[in-house]
Curated annotation (Swiss-Prot):
GO biological process terms on file: ribosomal small subunit assembly; translation
Record keyword Nuclease present: no
Protein name per Swiss-Prot or TrEMBL: Small ribosomal subunit protein uS19
The organism of origin for this protein: Mycolicibacterium paratuberculosis (strain ATCC BAA-968 / K-10)
A molecular function GO annotation: structural constituent of ribosome
Length: 93
């Protein structure tokens, strides 16, 4: 169920402060964050966020198409190595 429109999108306060400070200074430094739950808003466009995926920070450059999505959607947490191939020689013995 989506979030109520009267509440607006959720963005962590510390993240919003960092983006506003960079917008005032006209700088574009990487913003390191653990807040995967924050919704991307139009103020974030053009900024790069280092989103934590559980072991490292993944750089995410925000574009217009990402507005409305969560930061965590662009930093996958699981790595699929593939299924192990069946080794028939080892089974025959």
């Amino acid at each position: 169920m989506p979030r109520s429109l009267k509440k607006g999108p959720f963005v962590d306060g510390h993240l919003l402060k960092k983006v506003d400070a960079q917008n005032e200074k006209n700088t574009k430094q990487v913003i390191k964050t653990w807040s995967r739950r924050s919704t991307i808003i139009p103020d974030f466009i053009g900024h790069t966020f280092a989103v934590h995926d559980g072991r490292k920070h993944v750089p995410v450059f925000v574009t217009e198409a990402m507005v409305g999505h969560k930061l965590g959607e662009f930093a996958p947490t699981r790595t699929f190595k593939g299924h192990i191939k069946d080794d028939r020689k080892a089974k025959r013995r």
